[in-house]
Amino acid sequence: MYKLPQRNCADKQEYTVHMRKMGMVIFACLLLLIIFPTFGYADINTSSPLSIGQTLSSPDGVYELGFFSPNNSRKQYVGIWFKNIAPQVVVWVANRDKPVTKTAANLTISSNGSLILLDGTQDVIWSTGEAFTSNKCHAELLDTGNLVVIDDVSGKTLWKSFENLGNTMLPQSSVMYDIPRGKNRVLTSWRSNSDPSPGEFTLEFTPQVPPQGLIRRGSSPYWRSGPWAKTRFSGIPGIDASYVSPFTVLQDVAKGTASFSYSMLRNYKLSYVTLTSEGKMKILWNDGKSWKLHFEAPTSSCDLYRACGPFGLCVRSRNPKCICLKGFVPKSDDEWKKGNWTSGCVRRTQLSCHTNSSTKTQGKETDSFYHMTRVKTPDLYQLAGFLNAEQCYQDCLGNCSCTAFAYISGIGCLVWNRELVDTVQFLSDGESLSLRLASSELAGSNRTKIILGTTVSLSIFVILVFAAYKSWRYRTKQNEPNPMFIHSSQDAWAKDMEPQDVSGVNLFDMHTIRTATNNFSSSNKLGQGGFGPVYKGKLVDGKEIAVKRLSSSSGQGTDEFMNEIRLISKLQHKNLVRLLGCCIKGEEKLLIYEYLVNKSLDVFLFDSTLKFEIDWQKRFNIIQGVARGLLYLHRDSRLRVIHRDLKVSNILLDEKMIPKISDFGLARMSQGTQYQDNTRRVVGTLGYMAPEYAWTGVFSEKSDIYSFGVLLLEIIIGEKISRFSEEGKTLLAYAWESWCETKGVDLLDQALADSSHPAEVGRCVQIGLLCVQHQPADRPNTLELMSMLTTISELPSPKQPTFTVHSRDDDSTSNDLITVNEITQSVIQGR
């Protein structure tokens, strides 16, 4: 009889281990079979539908498509959300109107190529609604969060979720209208937080010129953003020239089209715009830990459309909130007292200029304008062509139907020919509005002004006489000619200033400034500019000032001095330094500015320690702020201003590191549509001057753009432009080499790498190189520059810029260079 071989203990142990391994392999295979349906698919096609419990991920893993149930209800919806972010944020829903109520459902490609959602009984719950004649299609989720249907044969995109929006916009999606084609793409709110079916609020883009964002409740306006002003919506408080706008607006009036798109919030890839079920527009971004609210509207009862009725004014800081515009009274006193302001106000005194007048100019002499500030301008506006501020006033004055006008930076002249609705008074920011009234409405205020002015004048006269007497007594005792107030010399200077149209500039006396600066003590010295030193001072009332001292030996003469006063007195912008006044005593001339605690940009940029206080985000904000200041100078101010000396030391920083362009001694201004001028006296700073200006004296908006490009590259690199000439190459050559090798991403100080986004740095280098192109025509204009910095649109490729190599003993490195062309080189120090 055959006997089985006997296994020893070692064989038994080996056999046991082997069987355990086999068991683990079998278990793993079974487990994979069980959980496989929950893995993300690459795409959806006729043979690979998406079922409940399965998901489709974008290639970068940011977005996910699948089935979800709001608040764990039995209703199933197909949606897109941010992957691995809790709580779940759904950004798009397919079957908003009709949820899946059965336990089984599939999202698949139909026989005609459309994307359809079928329940367990094969009933169609939702579809793209289009037949593409071929089932050789597939659906995939892109990195942008856009679900697309693609033809497998041609590769053509047949359908996009971005063209079928729900309540949310993602970067690169857009709200739009196309009047000829009858298209109007809007955001539509959910009915509630747990019900994605269409709610009562929509966010659309109006076909006005310029357009504005509008939230409707049903068919009625609920909130509006105010007209678009190049980089911002003018009716949103707090969004001024320093605001980094995530929006881009493109409008073609002739074609009847416009789009309102949203770009990424700088470094924050996870961001979105949504319209909530309560009718609020919100912008949110994720910092890796939680969602942060970037913007929200409406936030106040004054934000609600037509809150105070026609010709009413909603005042945010007032209770009750509604008052009538000046010259108007409540239409119904009883309703007004009850807090029902919807009927609004009516004019108290009729205008002399009537709309049915036989002549357009009738009433010009008897109607006046009342000027309001800090307002959200009314709805129902019209763009009055390409008019400057004065022409805007004259156009409205000569048109009997014009009830108000406004000249808005970034827009131009707006006029109102109908009732004024949805006018709001802000605490700060806002625009100016000029309201047409009968002259008698302003006569009372004028009489009050005359009486007040006379009283103030007499008081000042008495004070001056007393002060003059005390000053005379003091000089008699001290035998020192130190008057408290300027007399003959400053009186003469004031007369010289009158024809220069700088009457609004304050005149300081020398004694006051000497006291404020501790007699121009070296300890008060902030820095040295090309035209003289700058001192910190403190007035008697505690106000800190910066004093620019221009002696007879400085390079800035009377013409430049008057030019700086004349220009800055007319310019008002967040990114321009503010002039407080001036002073003259003998050969000395002083300019008094607001004091900016962080001095100039070069103080931080070129200091081995302080440079770490301005990380990449702060540098990017500074770049955009300077660009906005330039946009105001070149396009939005009443006069076109060419700075001609834009450089790092002329960019001052306030306590919030907001940049302000300074030093307008060399600036030139032109009116109307004049874009270019020339001069025989070429002045500026070497390295920053555009070739055509340095060689031929021709300057324009594009020569300032060139200087901005150099400035931008200096901010990125964090090195003085003079350092490169010492090394035998130029800043532009260094930047170009980096662009060719690494697209410029290695230019930023590596110590700041953690705070930067490489793509954003590279984009800024590309913009800088575009700005320093040899031919002015190859450089962007200021509007294009602003768009490049605030959007992620595709940029043109730069050409190799013209640059020269300086030797170490090159005279261009001199701090006091004055050539035969009178080119001046400033000492680069903080001011």
UniProtKB/Swiss-Prot annotation:
Question: What does the record say about its membrane topology?
Answer: Single-pass type I membrane protein
> Cellular location of this protein?
Cell membrane
Please give the residue positions where the record annotates the modification Phosphoserine.
Answer: 554, 569, 649, 662, 722, 814
Annotated active site residues, numbered on this chain, are 645 (proton acceptor)
Signal peptide as annotated in the record: 1-42
Instruction: Enumerate the spans annotated as Bulb-type lectin domain.
Output: 43-162
Kindly list the residue ranges recorded as spanning the membrane. 449-469
Segments forming domain PAN? 353-439
CDD domains linked: B_lectin (cd00028), PAN_AP_plant (cd01098), STKc_IRAK (cd14066)
Domain EGF-like residues, every copy: 298-334
What is the protein's given name?
Answer: G-type lectin S-receptor-like serine/threonine-protein kinase At1g61390
- Source organism per entry reads Arabidopsis thaliana
